[in-house]
Swiss-Prot record:
PTM-bearing positions, type Phosphoserine: 977
Protein's recorded name: Nonsense-mediated mRNA decay protein 5
Gene name linked to the record: NMD5
Note: Present with 13500 molecules/cell in log phase SD medium.
Compartments reported by the entry: Nucleus; Cytoplasm
Main location: nucleus
Keywords (A to Z) from UniProt: Cytoplasm, Nucleus, Phosphoprotein, Protein transport, Transport
Keyword match tRNA processing: no
Domain Importin N-terminal: 24-104
InterPro entries registered for this protein in UniProt: ARM-like, ARM-type_fold, Importin-beta_N
Amino acid sequence: MDITELLQCFACTLDHNAAVRTNAETHLKNASKVPGFLGACLDIIAADEVPENIKLSASLYFKNKITYGWSAGARQGSNELLDSHVDPDEKPVVKDMLIKTMVSVSKTSPRCIRVLKSALTVIISEDYPSKKWGNLLPNSLELLANEDITVTYVGLLCLAEIFRTYRWKNNDERQDLEELILNYFPALLNYGANVLFQDGKYMNNEQIGELVKLIIKIYKFVSYHDLPFTLQRSESFTPWACFFVSIIQQPLPQEVLAISDIEVRSKNPWVKCKKWALANLYRLFQRYASTSLTRKFQYDEFKQMYCEEFLTQFLQVVFDQIEKWGTGQLWLSDECLYYILNFVEQCVVQKTTWKLVGPHYNVILQHVIFPLLKPTAETLEAFDNDPQEYINRNMDFWDVGYSPDLAALALLTTCVTKRGKTTLQPTLEFMVSTLQSAVGDYNNIMLDNALQIESCLRIFSSIIDRLITKDSPFASEMEKFILTYVLPFFKSQYGFLQSRVCDICSKLGSMDFKDPVITSTIYEGVMNCLNNSSNSLPVELTAALALQTFISDDQFNMKLSEHVVPTMQKLLSLSNDFESDVISGVMQDFVEQFAEQLQPFGVELMNTLVQQFLKLAIDLHETSNLDPDSFTNVDSIPDESDKQMAALGILSTTISILLSFENSPEILKNLEQSFYPAAEFILKNDIEDFYRECCEFVENSTFLLRDITPISWKILELIGECNRKPDSMVSYYLSDFMLALNNILIYGRNELKKNEFYTKIIFEIYQKAVTAEDNSLDDLRVVFDLSQELVLALDDSLPQQYRERLLADVVGSILTQKNELKTNVVFSVTAFNVVISNMITEPLITLQYLKQQGCLEIFFQTWITDYIPNYKRCYDIKLSVLALLKIILKLESNDYSVLNLENLVPQLGSIVTQLASRLPTALRQLANQRKEFSSSGFEEDTKWDENFLDVGDDDENDDEGDLTEKYLELIKNRADSLDFVDGYDAKETFDDLEEDPLTGSILDTVDVYKVFKESIANLQHVDSNRYQGILRHLTPADQELFMGIMNA
């Protein structure tokens, strides 16, 4: 490998000239396939004379090659330069050189170290657990012995990555870890506490801070998922806990506190040491030393030691930190505050520790929660200049990591939920007194007072559900409180207060206001906010959500009905400005509520929504095609989840609009035309996330029209094109596509019989799906649903080669599963139905094929003995009756002999009669299901059973013991007595064969009794002997059923 030439290539990748860069990348692509390339990269990175920017370029290329090529199962990068695996013969050389290179550049090129660390992580995670890097641990320990802390840092990096490999394993899966902890953790702790930390002696040294942070994270890696037995012992836990506490308590040096940029200050290694020390102690408490219904690990001795020997003293440390922070004596990063508040919240949940926290609740509320919920200068700036960020952070739409205000809200809600008897009244009293002192003249409130009001209202918004429940002692006071302290701020000069009032109103849907003035005031306030002159997005958005809450209120609805169109236009505008599914949900409810008024504007609405969807979908598609390797780190990759949810919401709204035109076929066709560009973009660009909604639209439009329009046929063509692509995911999402295909087969069957072009599309979809790798029984069930519908739709127009393929696939599956046909009921009945469907059109060919494949006997034995007596679905009963009638009518006596089915003949009359007689019951059941579904929505006066949501105040049950502990004991006792083993019975029953009341079937229009009577009459005419034979074998009860059907 020519190092000089390679060096020149890396230099040229940084050239401003695109042609030069492209040429260099081509040379690198070729060079990367030559053994020794990665070693040459490391030589360049380690060379002192190479400029920093070229070293960094080589480091990034090396890192990407390792990321995508080290593991045999590594995903391939979208960058073709990276689509090659590392030569196994080169791996030992790379591992040896990598650590030496990192040591070499640790002083001079810290940016390269950060990049190479990613490569180190990949290699260690792959090779250390599989024992392919035997000298890694001793080499790392050797580096730790070096007096040069830059060298030590590399050694600790290696150790951290070694211990990271144990992070997600249970103790029984990592027994070798216990030995490592015994051998090395005492020395590691000593090095961290007595050499590096030394009671804060070197807290002005960031390099040492990085080393201490790595030691703390090593502890985190081994204790995060499970707690090693060695670390559960007092002699191990206590010194580590003391080390963490000493770091938490040690004041930060003035040089750190002098950093004005809070974000930069928070990234200081010593600040992060405090964060991870708090995180470790919180995790130990929450996961291993608490009582919880979801607690996986039962380490009672550790729990007792933590709570009795450590928790009380540490809680004093926590309170001391909070007190100093509250009085301005101590600065805490957001992350530290987050973990402190989480720790206190966990203490609230536990009965024993609540006794320690409870007496301090008022102080915590007034001096911690209240100030944290006051908007900061940054928050106010976001309200004006970055409204989407403000909404996500302050309106409970988005749980941002390490946000102290959200942690404060979580603490507050836990207090009032779990300890409401103690906390609700003082919380309400504090809100009232603060609001009274802060309000004064509503029309002239100073900013500082407005911030206090916002904090109070945010508290109220978070606990309102506890205050307005029927059993709340404060429920009767809430109307007056809302009228006095909430609704006046609709007219506030501060937009953030208007937004908060709307937010609160959106949570008042369960209240029955006795004073009609309240609803009128809410209507006027919400509509004014929705159409506010300042066009404040947070105000408009929360107003829309409040509107959604009251949209079904009679008084509110009556007023709103006069302004339907302009309100809908405003919602559309909001949907365009705010990328979230929140507004889509409002629009969907609005369309359903005011469908009649919106009908004249249906097509215009659809066009607007489709344009909005396309704008989002194009952005999402472009982002999905970005090369992830072009981003320097994971945080740089754009998060498009909000756009995706917004797009899904818009598609759902288009379906709601469609459904509102049930009785207007011409408008429905226009709506289909308007929707087509959305379907075309989804299917042509393989946007899998929207397949289901696209097919739902087709399902609903075809159902409402009872016809397949040219637009729907074009969509089928697009599905076919999508399916033919080599990397198509149509098979994977077949259950979604079945929504459209099912109705195309039902309402387009006449066209399908004439037009082989469309039939071929559906058959190709089937073909690709049935041969997909790793098909589960559930996947095959969907495939066989499609095949039987294809058979029934085409009837005798089904091409013979198609029938042969369909039968071959399903019979092969039946034979493969022959020992589980009675247990895998859902799959097996579906597979049998493919065969039965073929019997309806070609009974003799189908039976001959079963015999040829050695499947005839097992088929009839299972069908007649196990399935037919247990059928409950209309579809199964109809299908089998039709097939049995065809067998009776179409087969000659000789056919029965050749097939060895003579013994079946005497039974056929009884079987088909009994089965047909069960159809009315099945039809009634299906009709009831449809009736129940149509009336299952919540009525206007439907209320939640508030006791259902009430977990109770644990502080009310002190005398009887903690409810959680009692429930845990109950579960334990039941488990011990073997009342349940695995929670469910693996054997399926015919109850698992659900009949969807909303999904149509080709057999829906078939009058089975009419077919029955015509078939029997025809048999009597053409073969009176067989007719008499059938009647002769009927029991008196069967004869009565038979005559009842014939006379129906």
